[in-house]
Regions:
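Conserved C-terminal beta-signal and adjacent last beta-strands/turns
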Residues: 5-8, 19, 309-312, 348, ...
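Short, acidic, small-residue-rich periplasmic hinge/interaction motif at the N-terminus
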Residues: 29-32, 40-45, 72-78, 88-132, ...
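Short acidic/polar hinge/loop motifs at secondary-structure boundaries
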Residues: 60-63, 182-210, 229, 326
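Extracytoplasmic beta-strand/coil segments of soluble accessory domains associated
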Residues: 140-182, 204
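Transmembrane beta-barrel wall of Gram-negative outer-membrane proteins
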Residues: 238-240, 245-276, 281-318, 364-371, ...
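Gram-negative outer-membrane beta-barrel transporters
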Residues: 499, 601-603, 623-712, 783
Length: 786
């Protein structure tokens, strides 16, 4: 009897043990720097169970029975590692990965990025973080929760024409590179994300630098820089599909696939995407398509990668904004394309008031390991863009289109209705290079680029006229040509003075030559020949108080040339801008939290600030203002509150002032110490996440932007009200048989239905115009990964 009881107890205990389930949690780190690795994959071998590390480098795999497991841990740019775990209770492990001895795609962006010892201010955003939020909105909206960043959307729903400002600086002052290749338009200096829709789904990582930052290719950063790296090598074959749909008939379809590494040498990746939306604003529709294709050879000491990507966008124009009275009575009214009767009432709309543009990019990157301490990267690139704005012009004077009056017997007709297209056909090509040296205490990069924006044709076509005899079909009413040469060379040296103290020196020379000929759309001759020689030095120190704490300080000088709009719309020839930028801060990283506090001072001479006016195609007009400054404090941090709760937050307090601004609206009026246009004193962002249960995450995303002035006179009636917006996001992932992952996501934008505008303008008439944003709206997405 006693023996029977023992046997029965043993059976019960063993059954209980088998029934018990445990979890494996852990952190993945860089074995060299001890920094956490966000976005690393952790897979249980021979099982369809996996996890991806979060922003703290953490992972969790739950509901596992007792047993022995082998975990395969991978992260791009690092050697994969197998970790064995014997599971009889909940286990927590720390895994360190060694950097890959084989060259990786990261070398392409290494020269233009900052690292933890660089004494400048920056934020890294992983592709994993982008994908959680990527329901089809443009890149600016996905970066909305990085410090000191404000986003705009003409259509009001984040699809179509969008923009961003960093520390109050507009898009023309933010340097954007894709794989180290300049993306900003050479003439306008603007960044048109709409031309490469859904670029986020082909992005491996983004680094946002604030202030001047480190030397980069293209125009100097006068407010910040955004550095994108596209898809890196994935060693295993994959296929992915994303389907999203929601409010305003917004739809997104994306297909991605890759071969993985073939014969340990070759890899190919492809993506196609389609996004459509009716927009929140009336008729502000978007029809966007994009593609990405890459092929690479990965040798032990050589990487050769060819990339092509691009897009086609057709958007209905919505860049005029609405005055305050219209905002109150008809928020979604869109004056673009409106047709008026003699009494000034809207009688209809022109159905093809569109922007239609194609842009194709080609890049070839060659990376070579020269020795144990030297590697080199050479890149060639070519971009071809072409497209037009189409507009219906009511009562347009013939003389405005270079036409003679029409004489019919005793009647002279001097105006009429026309449909015109304003064309831009341009090419951008060149090469970049960098040589990188890394040994013990010394890190040295020598790099540069030569790029030409050439054969750029600006011209206007008349495609229809009310009076047929007044013009010919597709007759040109203006023609202009432009060319811009841009050369730069830089050297960056980071030296370890002691185990705790690092010195950083960054010296750059840049040459710009800009020439134009012909007329602009106002038929005024546009003949420019300008040359600039800039020297942009930077220097700083970083000091490691401990393995977790770094203090840094740097000072940088930058110079920047005017853009095309400055020349065209300026009453006097614009001057180039000069900037002195001081950055000082403290970074702390621990297993549980990361925190950064920094102070910045940006002193400008002849800053080209926004006047608050827009030109006839929605481009902001700027003017030199003598001396001005931006100064502030930025706080940012990420903390793991509990095993399930984490919080990522940032806040900026700043002052943005013109010391001596001269306003000229008929009467010259000198203004002292006025606020710089569209530069809020307060900006804050928050992402509060809860891993409610296995593979289910809920995130509350919050954004506060303070009051902004719409011109530089600091007139209280010309302001953009502060706003506080909350979004709610749900992400749930499953691992059904036969699939790597099935993801289900829901995004509730503007949870509390706040009526707000994210952007505004004034045309010098004392009237404020606003760009309203959507109230509560929804997007749902399904992601399939194989």
């Amino acid at each position: 009897m006693f023996k029977s009881m023992i046997v029965a107890a043993a059976v019960l205990l063993s059954t209980h043990a088998i029934a018990q389930q445990f979890s494996i949690t852990g952190t993945v780190k860089n074995g060299k720097s001890n920094q956490v690795l966000a976005g690393a994959s952790v897979q249980l071998e021979n099982q369809n169970r996996f996890a991806v590390t979060d922003e703290f480098g953490r992972f969790r795999i739950e509901k596992l029975p007792v047993g022995d497991y082998s975990m395969l841990i991978r992260f791009i740019g690092f050697q994969e590692k197998t970790e064995n775990v014997s599971l009889t209770q909940n286990v927590n492990v720390t895994v360190t990965l060694d950097e890959s001895v084989q060259l990786t795609d990261e070398v392409v962006v290494y020269a233009t990025r900052a690292n933890e010892k660089t004494p400048t201010t920056f934020t890294n955003v992983s592709g994993q973080a982008l994908s959680k939020q990527n329901f089809g909105q443009d890149m600016p909206l996905l970066l909305n929760w990085t410090p000191s960043l404000v986003t705009t959307s003409d259509a009001g729903a984040g699809v179509g024409y969008t923009g961003l400002r960093i520390r109050g600086s507009d898009a023309s002052r933010i340097n954007v590179t894709i794989n180290g290749i300049p993306y900003n338009d050479s003439e306008s200096q603007g960044t048109y994300w709409v031309d490469i829709p859904d670029v986020a789904s082909s992005t491996q990582s983004v680094q946002v630098q604030r202030g001047v930052g480190t030397s980069t290719n293209g125009g100097s950063a006068f407010g910040g820089s955004v550095n994108l790296q596209t898809t890196s090598l994935r060693t295993d074959p994959y296929a992915e599909g994303m389907i999203a749909a929601g409010s305003f008939n917004t739809q997104r379809y994306t297909m991605k696939a890759g071969t993985g590494l073939i014969n340990d040498r070759w890899a190919f990746d492809a993506k196609v995407s389609k996004i459509t939306s009716d927009g929140y604003v009336d008729r502000a529709s978007s029809d966007l398509g994009s593609y990405y294709l890459s092929g690479g050879y990965y040798g032990k000491k050589t990487v050769i990668k060819a990339i092509t990507f691009g897009g086609h966008e057709k958007t209905y124009q919505s860049w005029n904004g609405n005055d305050s009275e219209t905002i109150k009575t008809n928020r979604t009214f869109n004056s673009a394309g409106a047709l008026y009767d003699e009494a000034g009432n809207v009688k209809g709309y022109y159905d093809n008031e569109i922007d239609n543009y194609n842009q194709d990019h080609y890049q070839l990157h060659v990376t070579q390991q020269l020795s144990d301490h030297w590697n080199a990267n050479v890149s060639l690139h070519y971009t071809y863009g072409r497209g037009y704005y189409e507009q219906y012009k009511q009562g347009k004077a013939f003389s405005d289109l270079g036409l003679n009056d029409l004489v019919l017997k005793d009647t002279i007709i001097s105006s009429g209705d026309f449909i015109v297209r304003k064309w831009l056909d341009n090419k951008f090509y060149g090469g970049t290079f960098s040589f990188n040296y890394d040994k013990e205490k010394t890190n040295l990069t020598i790099g540069g680029a030569f790029n030409q924006y050439g054969h750029a044709k600006h011209y206007g076509e008349i495609i229809w006229a009310q009076y047929a005899a007044s013009s010919q079909i597709r007759q040109h009413y203006y023609d202009g040509l432009s060319q811009k040469n841009d050369f730069n060379i830089y050297a960056k040296w980071n030296y370890e003075i002691s185990p705790a103290l690092n010195a950083f020196i960054d010296l750059q020379y840049r040459y710009v030559g800009y020439t134009t000929a012909g007329t602009d759309d106002d038929l005024v001759p546009y003949d420019i020949s300008d040359k600039f020689n800039f020297f942009n030095p930077k220097a700083g120190l970083s000091y490691s108080l401990s393995a977790k704490d770094i203090l840094y300080a740097s000072y940088a000088i930058a110079n920047r040339e005017p853009n095309r709009t400055d020349y065209v719309n300026g009453d006097v020839k614009p001057k180039h801008e000069k900037l002195g930028n001081l950055e000082a801060g403290w970074r702390r990283n621990s297993d549980r939290y990361a925190f950064e506090a920094n102070y910045y001072l940006m002193n400008y001479t002849d800053q080209l600030v926004l006047t608050g006016k827009l030109d006839n195609v929605g481009n902001p007009i700027r003017a030199n203002v003598g001396k001005s400054y931006r100064t502030g404090v930025e706080l940012s941090g990420t903390i793991r509150l509990t095993e399930r709760w984490s919080w990522n937050a940032n806040a900026t307090w700043s002052r943005n002032k013109n010391k001596d601004y001269v306003a000229d609206f008929g009467n010259v009026d000198e203004k002292k110490n006025t606020s710089i246009v569209l530069s809020p004193d307060w900006i804050a962002g928050s992402q509060l996440s809860c891993n409610a249960f296995r593979n289910f995450q809920v995130t509350l995303l919050s954004k506060y932007v303070g009051k902004q002035y719409l011109d530089n006179t600091q007139t209280e009636s010309l302001t953009l009200d502060s706003y506080f917006i909350n979004d709610l996001r749900f992400n749930y992932t499953l691992s059904p048989r036969g699939m790597k992952e099935l993801g289900l996501s829901l995004l509730v934008n503007n949870l509390f239905d706040v009526k707000y505008s994210s952007n505004g303008a004034t045309y010098g008439d004392g009237v404020a115009y606003y760009f309203p944003q959507a109230g509560t709206n929804f997007m749902a997405m399904m992601t399939l990964k194989f």
